[in-house]
């Protein structure tokens, strides 16, 4: 018998879309999708039935109301229903379309044909239950930051003969693998991608194959920085970390251990109001913020060693 999932539907003002998506992910949803409805937005989230009871869903509704009130918007409408696994796995896909990000990327759903003669770097993606479709502001900010950091590296998928120093990157909280694949397409020599969610690691493996990335160049593994320490041969050149702010703060000491004086890092998953705490933790361990990019209520920190 198929597993049963909650399908949570939230109709909200468009300005609340990112906040609602973040709230659903924080609630434990394994996938989200959004659809424009005139001036409003319908956001859907999917959660295994055993992870939430009716009281939990009612509490989610209260949190969403509080989020809206805090920024002076009307309360969203929350509904839910039970669906079978095969239904949830495909229902959100109808709302996801090819999306250009930054100056160089196109995120193309795996179930759609790849565009021909396109002048952007195409990332084919089937996120499954993992976070990272390119729709969220934090993912976009990280990809745009990677463009900036790797702008000196040629477009060539193979960087060995490009006359550049090889760039080794760690992707902490890799989700669907979208940032790892983006880094490879921009010319990174190798990416070590870790996530504590085994389903996310599985998704990264699948998307690595979809994009025909050499397995030696993208190495996914289940775990966190402790696993990275075992995988890497030397400190990495770059770090990308798109996870919750509280987790970033906890990991900063360990992340610093896999860096060197020239290492740069990209941190997102951070609400603007949380940025001060994250910056303080980074500065305490020898990092300095070069730029902070904002999109709606989210921010992305581009940092380097002091």
UniProtKB/Swiss-Prot annotation:
Predominant cellular place of this UniProt entry's protein: cytoplasm
Gene Ontology annotations for the cellular component aspect, listed alphabetically: cytoplasm
Highest taxon of source: Bacteria
Residues that bind S-adenosyl-L-methionine: 139, 173, 195, 242
InterPro entries (UniProt xref): Ribosomal_L11_MeTrfase_PrmA, Ribosomal_PrmA_MeTrfase, SAM-dependent_MTases_sf
GO molecular function: protein-lysine N-methyltransferase activity
Family matches, as HAMAP family: Methyltr_PrmA (MF_00735)
Name assigned to this protein: Ribosomal protein L11 methyltransferase
Organism whose genome encodes this protein: Trichormus variabilis (strain ATCC 29413 / PCC 7937) (Anabaena variabilis)
